[in-house]
Structures are given as C-alpha cells and as structure tokens.
Amino acid sequence: MKSRLLFLGPPGAGKGTQAKLLCENQGLIHLSTGDLLRAEVNAQSPLGKEAALIMNKGELVSDEIVLSIVQKRLSADAKSGWLLDGFPRNLIQAQSLQQLLENVSQPIQAVLLIELDDETLIKRLLSRGRSDDTQEVIRHRLEVYREKTAPLVDFYQSLGILVKIQGEGDVKDVALTIRSALGLVM
C-alpha cells in the first residue's frame, strides 16, 4: 500500500473530506499544514512563536517555517504513513518539499489530484453558505488555484506519481475510486 500521500485539487473538490476518510480507513496520519501551524502557535514553540508574529500581521507564513513544521511532524511519529493536505501550493514549495522528504527517506508515493468541473465546484461551494463564498470570489479562487497549481500537476506527473481522480459523485463513490486507484480494493 502507498502510505505517503499528497492531495491536490481545487477548492470544493472534497480534499479534506476524502483525506479524513482515507486516513481513518488506512490508519494514516492526516497532516494538514493549517492544523500543524495552529498547533505550533498554541504550543508556543519557537517555530510557533515565529509563525504567530507573521500570522498576526495577516501575512503568509514562509515556506521555510511551514517546511520545518512538516519536517518536525514527520520525524515525530509519521513513519507509518501520512497524507499531506494543503501544501504545497506552488512549484517552489513542491520542489522544496520533495527534497526534504527525500532527505528523510520518506518520498511521496502518490499525489492524488481530485478533478471536478467548475460548475460543480461552484455549486458545492455556494451550498456551504459561507459569507465569503460568492460566485465572483469562488471564480477568482479557482483562477488562482489553476495559475498556481498547474505547474504542480506537471511536476508530479513528471515524477510518475500523479493519480487523477474524478471527483463527481457522492462521498462514498469518490472514496471508493481513491481506494481503488491506490490498490486498496480487493
């Protein structure tokens, strides 16, 4: 079984939902960079204090800090398998992450790209009822995603580890498709 995984996909594709299901089903550790950052800040670790200073200014935490936090978590207890969600977001981050993981002998084994058409994504995001989920904002987020993520798709495809998943259908169907693609269905 592939036990070092990364999820990619546009906003509304169901990455978080599918990551949670797969981790529960396979006993993987779900590494959400947002959750890891918040945990470091709450623990007031040196990395957390540095991240808090940046976050309190409304700025993005540097790639170096995020990579350090990911590395710390991986070396702690993620040897048995993990799924990384929410990072990387651009090609430089992907290349840095790949180097880091190779250095600790934990290279990514599969990158799951959940694909959906824009209209389905927009419908899903609008149904969440969040105040910032207007059609205009959602379309802009999709544009930004495509601009930043297209190079990641090519990068991981060139490494031979990209697996495309059709995200249409209900949660259980997509989960089954993912497990099947990873060879987890008998």
Swiss-Prot record:
Q: Where is this region: LID?
A: 127-133
Record's superkingdom? Bacteria
Q: What are the annotated GO cellular component locations? A: cytoplasm
User: Keyword Nucleotide-binding on this protein?
Assistant: yes
Per the record, what are the reactions this protein catalyses?
AMP + ATP = 2 ADP
Task: State the EC number(s).
Answer: 2.7.4.3
User: Which keywords annotate this record?
Assistant: ATP-binding, Cytoplasm, Kinase, Nucleotide biosynthesis, Nucleotide-binding, Transferase
Pathway it belongs to? Purine metabolism; AMP biosynthesis via salvage pathway; AMP from ADP: step 1/1
Quote the PROSITE patterns the UniProt record gives: ADENYLATE_KINASE
User: One biological-process term from Gene Ontology?
Assistant: AMP salvage
A molecular function annotated in GO for this UniProt entry is: ATP binding
Provide the protein's localization: Cytoplasm
Q: Where is this region: NMP?
A: 32-61
Q: Residues that bind AMP, according to the entry?
A: 33, 38, 59-61, 86-89, 93, 130, 141
For binding ATP, which residues are annotated in this chain's numbering? 12-17, 128, 169
Q: Where is this protein primarily located?
A: cytoplasm
Q: Which family does it belong to?
A: Belongs to the adenylate kinase family.
**Record text on subunit structure and interactions:** Monomer.
Anything noted about its domains? Answer: Consists of three domains, a large central CORE domain and two small peripheral domains, NMPbind and LID, which undergo movements during catalysis. The LID domain closes over the site of phosphoryl transfer upon ATP binding. Assembling and dissambling the active center during each catalytic cycle provides an effective means to prevent ATP hydrolysis.
Q: What is this protein called?
A: Adenylate kinase
Q: List the top taxonomic levels of the source.
A: Bacteria, Bacillati, Cyanobacteriota, Cyanophyceae, Synechococcales
Gene name, Swiss-Prot/TrEMBL: adk
